Regions:
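Bacterial Sec-dependent N-terminal signal peptides
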Residues: 1-23
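C-terminal PAP-associated
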Residues: 21-369
Length: 369
C-alpha cells in the first residue's frame, strides 16, 4: 500500500518563488507536415508471438557519477503497516474487459476517458495496440488496431500514451517508432475517437525512451529518457488544425547517481483552465543524499518544478526556468543501489521487479480550483 500525500498550494507558491535560471531551446525543429490516417482493425483471435518488450535501450547507460558516496538518513515516508481506508468506497459505475493478452511483457497499459469514449493502449509485437470503448456501456467500438496501421509513419515500437484533450475535445495517441529516433503522434480530426486522425512524426537526437506526454493550453509536451533529461514542446494549435507543426527541445541538468532519468510533464485536468499565460510545468524528485552527497539537507528531500514559456512564432523567446524546490519528507532512492533494474522480490517468483526509483509516476496532474 502506498502512502498518499498532497502537494498543497503548489502552483500558488510558484507564482511567488520564480528564480532567475532561464534556458533557451537547444534545438528548434523544422515544421512537420501531417498525413491523414484512418483506423484499420486487426483480425480478432490472432495473437502475437511471445516476446519481451525491451525498451531499455537508453536505460542501461552509465550513471552520472559523483565523487562522494551516497548518504542515508531515516526514510520517514516508508509505510510499514496497512492503514484502513479513511474514505468510503465509491459505487462502481462500469466494469468491462479491456484488450486481452498480447504476449508482450511488460504491457505498458495506457488509457484515458473522454466525453463519449474510453481508449486503451498496450504494447504489442508490432508496436502499440489500442481499442476504443463506449464509455456509457463499455462495449467495444470496432476491433483493436495497431498504431502503425493508422498511416505511413512506419512501424511503431510501443510505449503508448493515450491523451484526451478536453479543451479541444480531441484525442492524441503516441508511441516511439521502430525506425530510428522518432516519435509518432496521432491527433483526431474531430471528437470521434474512431474517425480520421492526423499523423505527425518528429525526429529526436537520441532514442526517446520512456516517453510521457501532457496537454496544456500552450502546447502538447513530452519528456523522455535520453541522458541529460530533455523536454519537448509541440505546436498544439497547428496540430489541431492538421497544419505543419514545429517542435522545440530543452534540457535540464542531469542528477548525479542516476543513469535512467526523466522529467514528468504536468498534465492539465478539470474544467477550470490555468490562468491566462500560465507556463507549462514539469517535475522530478531529488534525493539530495543520493545526488548531492556531502552537501545536502538532512531534514528534507525535494520536488523540483520547472516551467516552460513556449513561443512557437519566435523560438528564441521561449524560456525554461527552474522555479521551485518543494521540501518533502526524507526518502531513500538507494534501492539495490541507484541503477539496478532488478531489485524488488515477489512471492512465488525468482524474478525481481524494477523499483522505478528514478521518476515521478505518470501522471502528475494540474487542477485549478
Amino acid at each position: 500500500m502506498r502512502t498518499k500525500f498532497t502537494l498543497s498550494a503548489l502552483f500558488l507558491l510558484i507564482v511567488c518563488n520564480t528564480s532567475a535560471q532561464f534556458t533557451l531551446p537547444d534545438m528548434v525543429f523544422e515544421p512537420v507536415t501531417p498525413i491523414t490516417v484512418y483506423l484499420t482493425p486487426i483480425v480478432e483471435g490472432v495473437y502475437d508471438e511471445p516476446r519481451e518488450f525491451n525498451n531499455f535501450l537508453k536505460r542501461d547507460q552509465p550513471a552520472y557519477v559523483h565523487t562522494t558516496p551516497p548518504m542515508h538518513y531515516k526514510d520517514n515516508v516508508w509505510q510499514q503497516s496497512i492503514n484502513a481506508e479513511k474514505t468510503p468506497v465509491l459505487n462502481q459505475l462500469l466494469n468491462f474487459n479491456g484488450i486481452g493478452n498480447t504476449n508482450v511483457s511488460p504491457p505498458d497499459p495506457s488509457g484515458e476517458a473522454g466525453q463519449d469514449y474510453y481508449i486503451q493502449a498496450v504494447n504489442g509485437a508490432s508496436g502499440a495496440r489500442f481499442r476504443i470503448f463506449d464509455k456509457a456501456t463499455g462495449n467495444p467500438v470496432g476491433a483493436a488496431a495497431n498504431f502503425s496501421t493508422l498511416g505511413t509513419l512506419g512501424s511503431g515500437y510501443g510505449d503508448p500514451i493515450v491523451i484526451y484533450d478536453a479543451m479541444a475535445d480531441r484525442w492524441v495517441l503516441s508511441e516511439f517508432s521502430a525506425n530510428g529516433n522518432k516519435m509518432n503522434f496521432y491527433v483526431s480530426q474531430t471528437s470521434a475517437a474512431n474517425g480520421a486522425y492526423w499523423g505527425y512524426q518528429f525526429t529526436t537526437p537520441n532514442f526517446p525512451d520512456y516517453p510521457k506526454m501532457s496537454v496544456w493550453p500552450t502546447g502538447y509536451f513530452f519528456t523522455s529518457n535520453e541522458g541529460a533529461p530533455p523536454l519537448y514542446a509541440l505546436d498544439r494549435e497547428k496540430m489541431l488544425l492538421g497544419q505543419p507543426a514545429t517542435m522545440q527541445r530543452f534540457t535540464v541538468p542531469a542528477m548525479a547517481g542516476f543513469g535512467f532519468q526523466a522529467l514528468t510533464p504536468v498534465d492539465f485536468d478539470g474544467t477550470n483552465l490555468p490562468p491566462a499565460g500560465a507556463p507549462a510545468y514539469f517535475a522530478r524528485h531529488r534525493d539530495d543524499e543520493a545526488h548531492n552527497p556531502g552537501n545536502n539537507n538532512t531534514a528534507n528531500d525535494f520536488i523540483e518544478i520547472y516551467s516552460l514559456n513556449v513561443n512557437f512564432t519566435t523560438p528564441t523567446a521561449s524560456t525554461l526556468s527552474a522555479v521551485l524546490k518543494i521540501p518533502v519528507s526524507e526518502f531513500d532512492s538507494d534501492l539495490c543501489g541507484l541503477t539496478s533494474f532488478s531489485c524488488i522480490t515477489q512471492q512465488g517468483s525468482n524474478t525481481k521487479l524494477d523499483p522505478l526509483r528514478e521518476v515521478l509516476m505518470y501522471k502528475v496532474q494540474y487542477r485549478n480550483f
